[in-house]
């Protein structure tokens, strides 16, 4: 056997070994990307939450037992490409370490929750960031998202031995931002000046009318004339005149 034949014989066990290592550490990839709920739903995007469709039927062929957890991975968009599935879910994967890790795990479920093909009248959704009461340090906390994003999410199925399967990353998700009122340059300033001028003129007119009314009222209620005062001083009642007539008689 020549030297090339010997090299081929030596390479075969090495290739088999590499194949076994890769298959043992690789994750099953599920050809599914998480989707935002339809645009017609009010509140699917807010300043701190977003709403996903449930991955119904996506884990039915995965080698999992029913109690095995399926997590939702929430990541900063720029950290998604560097994400490595943890061998075990720990406290460091809670939202408190979101900025340091670039991701956190939340909304623990199992494939029983995500069974598909069953008629259901209820709208089955996942509301990310909808829990204001959980501790940021606790595993699975679904706390409000800290900013507008962008974010990416994926589902990660795990067993007691470690990660088993994962979906694709979603598209970038941007949350709503608070809108600040800004005056339109030029046009709104001129309109404001016109309104202020009109109100000033109206106020001046009302003030003049008020002064005229006050002056008129003062003139009409001024003191009586001297003639009226004389008449009032010499006025005697009928009763007093009768008494004087009786005395003179």
Swiss-Prot record:
Residues 216-249 are cytoplasmic. One of its GO terms (cellular component) is membrane. Keywords: Glycoprotein, Membrane, Signal, Transmembrane, Transmembrane helix. It comes from the Eukaryota. Residues 1-26 form the signal peptide. Residues 27-194 are extracellular. It is found in: Membrane. One of its GO terms (molecular function) is peroxidase activity. It is a single-pass type I membrane protein. The chain crosses the membrane at residues 195-215. GO terms for biological process: response to oxidative stress. Glycans are attached at residues 63, 82, 133. Belongs to the uroplakin-3 family. This is Uroplakin-3b-like protein 1.
